Amino acid sequence: MTKIKADPDGPEAQAEACSGERTYQELLVNQNPIAQPLASRRLTRKLYKCIKKAVKQKQIRRGVKEVQKFVNKGEKGIMVLAGDTLPIEVYCHLPVMCEDRNLPYVYIPSKTDLGAAAGSKRPTCVIMVKPHEEYQEAYDECLEEVQSLPLPL
């Protein structure tokens, strides 16, 4: 005689968990307090597409250490930060560096999605996208929208 355990969530919750996809609203729950300005759902998708194009041209900088090094060297681009990175101290100095150097930056909801867009199996908390003529139109569109976002106080 064996006991049959009832599934507390039901079959629809189990099917949702198997899909692996989380909605934008679910991702916003895990945001840290400094994640401002936060990209909209539409802008987030555009940024992911731009990042994928930049990866093909090898025009991205990935990770806190690499991004910080090239920002200090004067490299230009859009900085995309993951809003669910903890502890905050890992990358809280990067927005200040961007503001000092007039670089546009934006937060997106998920570090796992950011890493996946960059072609990595690992989560990535910060990526800098550099301009390139192959995807200049998509880059300019993202740059315009990121610059129009209000900066935090």
Curated annotation (Swiss-Prot):
Pfam families: Ribosomal_L7Ae. There is a cross-link at residues 3, 5 (Glycyl lysine isopeptide (Lys-Gly) (interchain with G-Cter in SUMO2)). The modification Phosphoserine is found at residue 19. The keyword Isomerase does not apply. Expressed in brain, colon, heart, kidney, ovary, pancreas, placenta, prostate, skeletal muscle, small intestine, spleen, testis and thymus. Also expressed at lower levels in the liver. There is a cross-link at residue 5 (Glycyl lysine isopeptide (Lys-Gly) (interchain with G-Cter in SUMO1)). It is found in: Nucleus, Nucleolus; Nucleus, Cajal body. One of its GO terms (cellular component) is box H/ACA snoRNP complex. There is a cross-link at residue 5 (Glycyl lysine isopeptide (Lys-Gly) (interchain with G-Cter in SUMO)). GO terms for biological process: rRNA pseudouridine synthesis; snoRNA guided rRNA pseudouridine synthesis; snRNA pseudouridine synthesis; telomerase RNA localization to Cajal body; telomere maintenance via telomerase. Disulfide bonds: none annotated. It comes from the Eukaryota. One of its GO terms (molecular function) is RNA binding. Keywords: Disease variant, Dyskeratosis congenita, Isopeptide bond, Nucleus, Phosphoprotein, Ribonucleoprotein, Ribosome biogenesis, RNA-binding, rRNA processing, Ubl conjugation. Part of the H/ACA small nucleolar ribonucleoprotein (H/ACA snoRNP) complex, which contains NHP2/NOLA2, GAR1/NOLA1, NOP10/NOLA3, and DKC1/NOLA4, which is presumed to be the catalytic subunit. The complex contains a stable core formed by binding of one or two NOP10-DKC1 heterodimers to NHP2; GAR1 subsequently binds to this core via DKC1. The complex binds a box H/ACA small nucleolar RNA (snoRNA), which may target the specific site of modification within the RNA substrate. During assembly, the complex contains NAF1 instead of GAR1/NOLA1. Required for ribosome biogenesis and telomere maintenance. Part of the H/ACA small nucleolar ribonucleoprotein (H/ACA snoRNP) complex, which catalyzes pseudouridylation of rRNA. This involves the isomerization of uridine such that the ribose is subsequently attached to C5, instead of the normal N1. Each rRNA can contain up to 100 pseudouridine ('psi') residues, which may serve to stabilize the conformation of rRNAs. May also be required for correct processing or intranuclear trafficking of TERC, the RNA component of the telomerase reverse transcriptase (TERT) holoenzyme. Belongs to the eukaryotic ribosomal protein eL8 family. It is linked to Dyskeratosis congenita, autosomal recessive, 2: A rare multisystem disorder caused by defective telomere maintenance. It is characterized by progressive bone marrow failure, and the clinical triad of reticulated skin hyperpigmentation, nail dystrophy, and mucosal leukoplakia. Common but variable features include premature graying, aplastic anemia, low platelets, osteoporosis, pulmonary fibrosis, and liver fibrosis among others. Early mortality is often associated with bone marrow failure, infections, fatal pulmonary complications, or malignancy. This is H/ACA ribonucleoprotein complex subunit 2. It comes from Homo sapiens (Human).
